């Protein structure tokens, strides 16, 4: 357990996921944590967990050694107005599209770590990229311990975060799209909604396990299911004829492009 005073700006879904992860793993004790938000109801729920709450961000800034910015980017500039120069401020941002340099421009002299999480963090099954290069070893370890409680973490330079946004940050939506298509196809062929969903979801869970435990490449896994003259190969042929793989890659590239545009205009 760390003895740092930790502030969390925001009390939305992701902020709550972070807070719950911290409390579940004991990274920081509740009495050392303060959360700010404008919503009294959200703060009341958080207060019941033994955590301090405030509505004034200035109070949070002055009473925290590390501050997690867990708000939407469009809210950020409003929060920045509450900032007054504080020595040795350490910012941990999960805001998409706002770079470390942009944050340093607002928080003069601050050290900044940037995190790119995704929504499965809400269930402790997220994927997080972390750039905490500004922090000393103890600060880095704190950041990694916090976000390990939300899923898997990788250390990566911020210059790759637009790609991370496109692959894992937005990735759950792509997977949901494919899952929905499979469920709908099953229903079109006479399966009930419940059965089609159950079979589809377990297929995804099992396929992920197969990929994680593979001793060969993914292309070989595909070929292992595609018996010549069989059923699977007909579906895979159709995917190839319709350029499914290129369609997916093109969508991911467009996502990366938009992420870069948002960063440049922040």
Q: Which residues make up each language-model segment?
A:
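Short pre-catalytic strand/loop immediately N-terminal to key active-site residues, enriched for Gly-Thr
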Residues: 112, 161-166, 218-223
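Small-residue helix-packing motif on alpha-helices
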Residues: 33, 60, 192-199, 221, ...
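NAD(P)+-binding Rossmann beta1-loop-alpha1 motif at the extreme N-terminus of oxidoreductases
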Residues: 1-55, 61, 125, 187-188
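Short acidic capping loops at alpha-helix termini that bridge into adjacent secondary structure
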Residues: 29-32, 63, 89, 194
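NAD(P)-dependent Rossmann-like dehydrogenase/reductase catalytic/cofactor-binding core
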Residues: 201, 205-266
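Internal alpha-helical scaffold of NAD(P)-dependent oxidoreductase catalytic cores
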Residues: 102, 106-111, 127-163, 176-213, ...
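Rossmann-like NAD(P)(H) cofactor-binding subdomain of soluble oxidoreductases
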Residues: 49, 57-128
